[in-house]
UniProtKB/Swiss-Prot annotation:
Residues 4-191 form the RNase H type-2 domain. GO terms for cellular component: cytoplasm; ribonuclease H2 complex. It is an enzyme of class 3 (hydrolase). This is Ribonuclease HII. A divalent metal cation binds at residues 10-11, 106. HAMAP family: RNase_HII_B (MF_00052_B).
Length: 191
């Protein structure tokens, strides 16, 4: 009898002004779920950056499989954030070593590009460890990329706000202009 597999799926960076949107996909068995919960896994927004970073190696080690997908700022501008987010999620799912029978998606974004079973779950990170794990992987991967970009674009203070529309970031955009990694469609009211 074939084992039924579900992949948790979540996105990070959807509302940022800078950089790509990331998505994580994770398949966990019951034992891995319990182990991650015992290690403190929960909604990535409720974890410190250090705790998230400490969970990443464990998630990668004990998950059945995991993957990250992303869509660039250019894709976001060309496709819109909804379609770009969906592409990032589909990319993550397609990169999984094993294709799941069902997707458990945090939020309410049905994937039009996925022809299999899917379930959207509001506050899914609180209900499904696989979604929480996907969120942690995506958040840490995106934050790491943005911190590297902060070295290239130090005038924007990216290490402080990871690309979100804080007053500091908006002021820097007004002063220095946009980079090729800024989402032009998100900046219409700033410049």
């Amino acid at each position: 009898m074939k084992a039924y597999t579900a992949a948790g799926l979540d996105e990070v960076g959807r509302g940022a002004l800078f950089g790509p949107v990331f998505a994580g996909a994770v398949i966990l068995d019951n034992q891995a779920e319990d182990q991650l919960i015992d290690a403190g896994l929960k909604d990535s927004k409720k974890l410190s950056a250090l705790k998230r970073s400490n969970l990443v190696p464990l998630i990668k080690k004990i998950s059945h499989c995991w993957a990250i997908g992303q869509s660039s700022a250019r894709e976001i501008d060309l496709l819109g954030i909804r379609n770009a987010t969906e592409k990032a999620m589909i990319r993550a799912v397609h990169r999984l070593e094993k294709q799941p029978d069902v997707l458990l998606i945090d939020g309410c974004l049905n994937l039009r590009l996925w022809h299999g079973e899917q379930k959207t779950v509001i506050k899914g990170e609180d209900l499904y460890p696989s979604i929480a794990a996907a969120s942690v992987l995506a958040k840490v991967a995106r934050d790491d990329l943005i911190k590297r970009m902060a070295e290239k674009y130090p005038q924007y203070g990216l290490e402080k706000h990871v690309g979100y529309g804080t007053a500091l970031h908006r002021a820097a955009i007004s002063k220095f202009g946009k980079t090729k990694l800024h989402r032009k469609t998100f900046l219409s009211k700033i410049q």
